[in-house]
């Protein structure tokens, strides 16, 4: 007990001593800080002899930057006095760096103002002379500044000193303001990037405006010439660009409207020319020396004696190059397609009223925006709105449902922003979808100089859209059932038949559904009959891969790089050697339902598609793949990455839309041919109303083609007959029993074989591998049961 008391008493005595010591230090600190402040004030204002001496000393050391030294010393003194702590290291370093930067600035100013070129004499003597000859305010950076400049100018030149000064000044502000270098550099780069993007956008916008002005001038000239020739005024539903042309339905500003109606109104003016072009084509066909029994006007030309000798399924060979040209063959006339009927479209007064409703709706939700342009398309009308400055685009996008409610629309699609323009596009469905036919899409470019140009439909502005397969170079078409996918495929095939001859383009059609493409059996453009067996389809794709490799061998021996160069080489050889060596035709492979092929032979089909899409462009082979199940197990990453051009029809979810085109939007399409198209190298989608083609029109074109020339199938390209899987054997003695057991139970798994035959896991796994290799069972798909591909009654399902 006494010892404990002694310890506590000694602790109390120690605490008392430290407290007394702190109390004694406090007045000394205040006295020291007061003295420092007084000396700084005397020196800064040069008060008395002491003040002039202090200022002279600091001027000799720091020059014109001494005033910053006064301020820094004063701030540090006050901070230490009241906070009883030394300033943070980061800000202390920032103050020192700022002092150093000002030393460089002051000395550089003195250096340039006195035209100092070299300093051969010693620094101290030079500084002393300058100090004696110079008044206080103009004495450079003092002794320290002279030494620094004397050191750095020979090392990094005067330009390097200026750059270092700027960097020191920037670093000092970053340190003093306690900022992060990463944040500063990031914000700097972001500002530079945004400014460069803004500059590039403004340049693009100016170019587009100039282009639009040129187009408008050209259109005005054409309109004047047309008025003089026809002596008629423009129709009310032409493109309206003048405010006076609008019906006065309100006091608001009128909006220019561009639309699908323009295309319909221009059609009668050029109908005579088009009819004349078709008649000239028919007269030319009649003038050809042939033994036709019927006229071409009846669309049923008879074949020549040479064509009659060809069998419907004669076996040919493509071992050398291609097929010899048939001089008697003529492409089908466009008159085989039905003339589109004029339909009642949305009135412009109604469209303008909806534009005003749209403006008022946005204004009610606090969004200041103005409708600047309206485009009436076949299926939707696009309202182009320009938001005021400071309005976020996301705010307009979030009003999606409110806009649909105000316009009484089924659904609206917002394109924010429109690519290349400072505006937002709001696409509203029309009350009635205008039918777009393939004839009106093709008639402006028929016959096309490009062999693989096919018609797709009309865009929002009503302009016809056609694509060239050799530029795509491969196409993915996907959408739900009934969305217009099969009609699009028929339009592509019919466009090829209308534009090319059999020796120019060859087709390979794969139709596992067995009902969509069978109508094309027998046309001379086919390499082989339409493939409907999924097992044969994978073999047919392998044949295409072999043909691709063979063509590359031809390119190698002829020192050419692609099919165009090779055909030019063949034409040159024919002229020089007076030969008739045929040219290589383009090959278009069309798969109507990829999901069925992936289900039966997924790995083989995927590998073949990968090789074709990666290498076949130069060989003149192009692939079109269609599917109604746009899931990731059908459209795999490998297939998607190698097919750059895609068409998305209406789908059920945004996930499916992202699987097809890599972005949402297809889930808001209207169906019936409404599609989103993404071309090769494009990052934005184009909304198109697909061209409609009836079954009767397809049949008429097919009949015309078949009557002129029969199919000449290539035996080398035909897939082998499917192997009878019941005769396949395995090294395992239990294979036959396992085969019968699996097709009887219609299910298969490793554990099931283990229990049934009382074998180990390894042997059962080998049996499963043999069954999969022989295409008795499908591949494994996670936790899902394997699909059985055969049964007892019918060997192939």
Curated annotation (Swiss-Prot):
Family: Belongs to the FtsK/SpoIIIE/SftA family.
Any Gene Ontology biological process: cell division
Membrane-side (Cytoplasmic) residue stretches: 172-797
Residues annotated as transmembrane: 31-51, 60-80, 92-112, 151-171
Keyword ATP-binding tagged: yes
GO molecular function per UniProt: ATP binding; ATP hydrolysis activity; DNA binding
UniProt name for this protein: DNA translocase FtsK
Keywords (A to Z) from UniProt: ATP-binding, Cell cycle, Cell division, Cell membrane, Chromosome partition, DNA-binding, Membrane, Nucleotide-binding, Transmembrane, Transmembrane helix
Database matches in PROSITE patterns: FTSK
Compartments in which it is found: Cell membrane
Quaternary structure, from the entry: Homohexamer. Forms a ring that surrounds DNA.
Ranges of Basic residues composition bias in the record: 1-21
Amino acids binding ATP: 482-487
Domain FtsK: 462-658
The gene coding this protein: ftsK
UniProt entry tagged with the keyword Heme: no
Membrane topology category: Multi-pass membrane protein
């Amino acid at each position: 007990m006494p010892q404990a008391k002694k310890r506590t008493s000694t602790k109390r005595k120690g605490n008392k001593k430290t407290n007394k010591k702190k109390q004694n230090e406090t007045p000394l600190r205040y006295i020291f800080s007061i003295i420092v402040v007084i000396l700084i004030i005397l020196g800064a204002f040069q008060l008395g002899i002491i003040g002039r001496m202090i200022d002279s000393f600091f001027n000799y050391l720091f020059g014109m930057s001494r005033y910053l030294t006064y301020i820094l010393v004063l701030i540090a003194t006050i901070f230490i006095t009241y906070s009883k702590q030394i300033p943070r290291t980061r800000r202390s370093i920032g103050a020192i760096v700022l002092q150093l930067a000002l030393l460089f600035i002051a000395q550089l100013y003195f250096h340039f103002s006195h035209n100092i070129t070299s300093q051969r004499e010693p620094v101290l003597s030079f500084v002393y002379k300058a100090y004696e000859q110079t008044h206080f305010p103009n004495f450079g950076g003092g002794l320290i500044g002279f030494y620094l400049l004397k050191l750095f100018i020979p090392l990094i030149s005067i330009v390097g000193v200026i750059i270092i000064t700027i960097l020191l000044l920037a670093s000092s502000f970053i340190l003093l303001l306690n900022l992060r270098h990463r944040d500063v550099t990031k914000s700097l780069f972001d500002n530079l990037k945004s400014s460069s993007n803004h500059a590039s956008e403004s340049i693009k916008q100016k170019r587009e405006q100039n282009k639009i002005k040129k187009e408008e001038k050209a259109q005005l000239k054409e309109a004047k010439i047309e008025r003089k020739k026809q002596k008629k005024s423009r129709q009310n539903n032409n493109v309206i660009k003048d405010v006076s042309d609008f019906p006065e339905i309100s006091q608001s500003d009128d909006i220019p409207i561009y639309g699908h109606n323009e295309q319909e109104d221009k059609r009668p003016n050029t109908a005579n020319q088009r009819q004349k072009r078709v008649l000239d084509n028919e007269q030319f066909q009649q003038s050809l020396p042939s033994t036709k029994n019927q006229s071409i006007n009846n669309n049923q030309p008879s074949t020549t004696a040479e064509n009659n000798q060809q069998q419907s399924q004669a076996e040919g060979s493509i071992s050398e190059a291609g097929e010899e040209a048939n001089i008697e063959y003529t492409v089908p006339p466009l008159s085989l397609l039905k003339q589109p009927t004029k339909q009642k479209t949305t009135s412009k007064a109604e469209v303008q009223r909806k534009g005003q409703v749209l403006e008022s709706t946005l204004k009610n939700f606090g969004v200041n925006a103005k409708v600047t342009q309206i485009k009436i398309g076949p299926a939707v009308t696009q309202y182009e709105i320009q938001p005021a400055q400071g309005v976020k685009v996301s705010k307009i996008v979030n009003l999606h449902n409110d806009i649909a409610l105000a316009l009484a629309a089924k659904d609206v699609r917002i394109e924010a922003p429109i690519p290349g323009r400072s505006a937002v596009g709001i696409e509203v469905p029309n009350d009635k979808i205008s039918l777009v036919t393939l004839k009106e899409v093709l008639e402006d470019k028929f016959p096309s100089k490009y062999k693989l140009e096919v018609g797709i439909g009309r865009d929002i502005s009503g302009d016809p859209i056609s694509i060239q397969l050799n530029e795509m170079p491969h196409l993915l078409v996907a959408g739900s059932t009934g969305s217009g996918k099969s009609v699009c495929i028929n339009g592509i095939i019919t466009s090829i038949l209308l534009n090319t001859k059999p020796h120019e383009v060859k087709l390979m059609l794969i139709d596992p559904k067995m009902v969509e493409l069978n109508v094309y059996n027998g046309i001379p453009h086919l390499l082989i009959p339409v493939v409907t067996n999924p097992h044969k389809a994978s073999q047919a794709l392998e044949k295409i891969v072999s043909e691709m490799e063979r063509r590359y061998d031809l390119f190698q021996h002829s020192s050419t790089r692609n099919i165009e160069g090779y055909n030019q080489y063949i034409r040159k050889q024919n002229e020089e050697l007076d030969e008739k060596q045929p040219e290589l035709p383009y090959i278009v492979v069309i798969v109507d339902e990829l999901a069925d092929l992936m289900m039966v032979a997924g790995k083989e089909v995927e590998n073949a598609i990968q090789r074709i899409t990666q290498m076949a462009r130069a060989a003149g082979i192009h692939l079109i793949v269609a599917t109604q199940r746009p899931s990731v197990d059908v459209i795999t990453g490998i297939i998607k990455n190698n097919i750059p051009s895609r068409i998305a029809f209406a789908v059920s979810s945004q996930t499916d839309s992202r699987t097809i085109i890599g972005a949402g939007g297809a889930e808001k399409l209207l169906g019936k041919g409404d599609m989103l198209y993404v071309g090769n190298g494009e990052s934005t989608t184009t909304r198109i109303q697909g061209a409609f083609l009836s079954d009767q029109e397809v049949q008429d074109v097919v009949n015309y083609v078949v009557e002129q020339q029969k199919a000449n199938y290539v035996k080398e390209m035909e897939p082998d007959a499917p192997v009878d899987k019941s005769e396949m054997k395995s090294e395992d003695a239990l294979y036959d029993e396992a085969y019968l057991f699996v097709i009887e139970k219609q299910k298969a798994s490793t554990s099931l074989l283990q229990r049934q035959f009382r074998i180990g896991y390894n042997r059962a796994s080998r049996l499963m591998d043999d069954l999969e290799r022989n295409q008795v069972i499908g591949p494994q798909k996670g936790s899902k049961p394997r699909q059985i591909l055969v049964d007892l009654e019918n060997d192939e399902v």
